[in-house]
Amino acid sequence: MAEYGAHITTASVADDQPSIFEVVAQDSLMTAVRPALQHVVKVLAESNPAHYGFLWRWFDEIFTLLDFLLQQHYLSRTSASFSEHFYGLKRIVAGSSPHLQRPASAGLPKEHLWKSAMFLVLLPYLKVKLEKLASSLREEDEYSIHPPSSRWKRFYRAFLAAYPFVNMAWEGWFLTQQLRYILGKAEHHSPLLKLAGVRLARLTAQDMQAIKQRLVEASAMQEPVRSVGEKIKSALKKAVGGVALSLSTGLSVGVFFLQFLDWWYSSENQEAIKSLTALPTPPPPVHLDYNSDSPLLPKMKTVCPLCRKTRVNDTVLATSGYVFCYRCVFNYVRSHQACPITGYPTEVQHLIKLYSPEN
């Protein structure tokens, strides 16, 4: 087995095909960036809901737009996505002979560029939305938010039953392709690369030199602009390029920070972290009647602040500590993504059901 593994490693190194470690590392790069940015946006939204709340509500769409600008910038200038270029890889058209391959600095052909952009940006966006839909429907089904006569009841229950198997088949498809790639039976580690009609290869020294040369020429060259339309087009092109370059620089710095955080919070370092960051337990608050004079709060503590009736299925918001009826606060949070009393950004997962001794 060791000899066969060494043979595979030697063959992959001799060829321009990257190793499984390189392709898996570049795949995990953007996967780590998304939750990191999401956490930053969440902190901003909680600190100032009026100014940054929209970033949290529309995070998926904003991230997808910025991701598209970033990936399109790299695909058209380096023939690679951001993470692939970061690890010194490029995309080449599958099945093309070596002497007919385009240089990496020329970018991908339009057909392969748009296919690559769709699988890099649009597909992850749809997958995230599908996961959120499944989570929301599962929550509604668990607490019977929909009335029994709802015509969508059969549909969403069938969706919830089928989704785990579809997701398992999807992940199994990718795992099978990676195993075939390790064994040298496939030239694509991901089925999406095959669907896009490209494969990954290592950047050569000539590719790196050509990419640097193109960047220098692009910054030094000033094209004469005649008509107003050309001026607008040139300005938009420069703006998009500037945004993509800023994102690229920021992500390149952030990647090292993310790797440090990953090391810091790894299981091997937990004992050392606990000894370094251990602090004494803070004293309890003097009282818990904060903002008790608010007109939104009822005088009786057993009354729901939303429906003004005796609470049913007591549920507390983890973001503010106020208690409501489950049905009332679920519908409010789902519509407004905020606490009804404080306005703090809130999601459905922040609802915590309470079970009193009387029940």
Swiss-Prot record:
Matching CDD domains, A to Z?
mRING_PEX12
Species per Swiss-Prot/TrEMBL record: Mus musculus (Mouse)
Provide the gene name from the record. Pex12
One GO cellular component from the entry? peroxisomal membrane
Quaternary structure, per UniProt, is:
Component of the PEX2-PEX10-PEX12 retrotranslocation channel, composed of PEX2, PEX10 and PEX12. Interacts with PEX19 via its cytoplasmic domain.
What name is this protein filed under? Peroxisome assembly protein 12
Q: Which Gene3D superfamilies match?
A: Zinc/RING finger domain, C3HC4 (zinc finger)
Where in the cell is the protein located?
Answer: Peroxisome membrane
* Entry remark concerning the domains of this protein: The three subunits of the retrotranslocation channel (PEX2, PEX10 and PEX12) coassemble in the membrane into a channel with an open 10 Angstrom pore. The RING-type zinc-fingers that catalyze PEX5 receptor ubiquitination are positioned above the pore on the cytosolic side of the complex.
Q: In which pathway does it act?
A: Protein modification; protein ubiquitination
Role: Component of a retrotranslocation channel required for peroxisome organization by mediating export of the PEX5 receptor from peroxisomes to the cytosol, thereby promoting PEX5 recycling. The retrotranslocation channel is composed of PEX2, PEX10 and PEX12; each subunit contributing transmembrane segments that coassemble into an open channel that specifically allows the passage of PEX5 through the peroxisomal membrane. PEX12 also regulates PEX5 recycling by activating the E3 ubiquitin-protein ligase activity of PEX10.
One record GO biological process: protein polyubiquitination
Q: Which UniProt keywords apply?
A: Membrane, Metal-binding, Peroxisome, Protein transport, Transmembrane, Transmembrane helix, Transport, Ubl conjugation pathway, Zinc, Zinc-finger
Q: Where are the zinc fingers (RING-type)?
A: 304-343
Q: Mind telling me which Pfam families this protein's record contains?
A: Pex2_Pex12
Zinc recorded as keyword: yes
Q: Which GO terms describe its molecular function?
A: ubiquitin ligase activator activity; zinc ion binding
What family does this chain come from, according to its entry? Belongs to the pex2/pex10/pex12 family.
Could you list which ranges are Cytoplasmic topological domains? 48-51, 140-144, 278-359
Q: How does it sit in the membrane?
A: Multi-pass membrane protein
Q: Which sites bind Zn(2+)?
A: 304, 307, 325, 328
Membrane spanning residue stretches: 20-47, 52-76, 110-139, 145-183, 250-277
The source's superkingdom equals Eukaryota
Q: For side Peroxisomal matrix, which residue ranges?
A: 1-19, 77-109, 184-249
Q: Does the keyword Disulfide bond apply?
A: no
